[in-house]
Amino acid sequence: YESDQFMGNVYVDIELLRNLKFHSDFTLASYNYDNSYFSPSYLQEIWVGSPYYAQLTTNNSKYASTSINFRLDYNYHTGKHLFGAMAGYGADRSRSTGGTNMYQGFPNDDNLDNVGSAQSVLMYSDYVAKSGLNSVYGRLSYDYDSRYLLEVSMRADASSKFGPGNQWGVFPAVSTGWVINREAFMEKASWIDNLKMRLSWGQTGSTNVSDFSFRQFYTSSQYGESSSVKLQDLLPNRGIHWEKTNEVNFGLDFSFFGDRLYGSLDAYYRYTDGALAPAPHILESGMSNYYDNIIDMSNRGVEVSLGGYPVRGKDFAWNTDLNISVNRNRIESLNNAQINSYMQDAFIVGKPAGTVKGYIVDHIVQNMDEVNELNAKAVEKGFAEYQSGIGVGDFLMKDTDGNGTITSDDRQVIATPEPKFFGGWTNTFTYKNLSLSFLMQFSCGGEAVYSNLGEEISGVLGQSVGRELYGNTWTPERTDAKYARLVAGTMSYNYMANDRFVFDTSYLRMKNITLSYSLPKAWINKLYLSNASLFVTATNLFTITQWPGLDPETVATGITSMGTNNDPYPLSRSFSLGVKLQF
């Protein structure tokens, strides 16, 4: 495995005229990645149970992006009036290339990189992707006596992700501010350092879709000595366009008692019109993917930040900051579209995005008499059986629709990934040149399906039984167990998402803690430095949670799977020691 990364930035600022400035910057970023995996013949033999040739798989990718911006800023100040104007242009470009190759039939297990000695090429694939974004933007601002504030802005973006006629998106915004403590009637309130009210409205855009989804592409593949060219598995839609989000925000900033107490309050409402998602299409096309602007959703919430200095002395100070956020997401409309079966559970009108549907477990079957009775009733209603593949020790699901048999229509909402609230608490203690700071991160009230349980119960991937299941599955001697029996390689209803796999994802985490020491001024002056310090930092030190898996924060991030967790790679715990120098 090899990788290298580069990022560079240059900029220039020029004062063209009095009050008129020109700014330009250019950013270049690149990332190269090469990886190879060699499977010796003996390893393949152990895995598949029969002699096999050695294999070599190589992966490589290259990514490069550029960004260039030009901006003019003008400010004019007269008396109590301050006028400002800004106009700019930006262009972003990105290009990625890569490929995956698989070779087989090496003469021995020592040829780790000599692909020329392979007897055959099992797979060869490569790709090239390009994207671009052009932007023009402007802003006008007015400030009267640092008391009344007004700002109007507009930006227009053109994205290569959309086809002709839909590439441009225009996004206006307006904001106002009132610095209340500068009013004459507040002169006697000397304990108020700052009291500012804010109100804003604006539009933003998103290109939440893969590149060139409006255009049909071809893809080639090779298997052994044969190769083929076929249509890419994406039905193009020339009508897709920018997602647009309207947001209204009310805010209040405050600071009291010489900044001993400060904070802010924000209440917002966001409405996204035409969010992009997989949509229904003609099955005869043979394509499984098709995107359209079909989802309308809203977000409303409150964000509170409160901080201060409970202690601020000559040698010792304690600074603390607490922020709490509450957000409520809701799917408002699907615009008469029927989401495909893979996505429909994640987008339920009236529910948050990512909501999980699953079966409700009635109980665990203790004898076949009960099953036979249910099957007999199901046959009377014209069904083959009550629940397919069921046996003693299995989950018996509730027939929620009352039709006499278990189908996917019996699934109900079992988990909502949206937490009741979340936030962080930062504390910094300073004693002379020594400083200790830490951040506690928390989330309360979210739910997720621990999907590992279904895989472990059924043994479909050959994995071992985890801590949650161990000693807690049904056996003839353990009939009061929470979980169904262990049956290897069986895709029964025991495998399906159900309410017994749902757990609270609340947690309290020590996100980071840093101890630092600033060198005395006398030492710094001798070293011709402006500042110097030593520090040691630990991240993700510990987590307090009832989640049974590795990490409650690593639930899947995709909309369709954000309410599930099958133990992806957890956040790593790290320790670092460093020196910070300022010249």
Report residues per predicted region.
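C-terminal beta-signal and terminal closure region of outer-membrane beta-barrel proteins
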Residues: 213, 217, 294-299, 341-369, ...
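Extracytoplasmic gating/loop element in the C-terminal half of outer-membrane beta-barrel translocons
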Residues: 159, 443-534, 538-539
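Conserved small-residue
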Residues: 292, 309-416, 457, 539
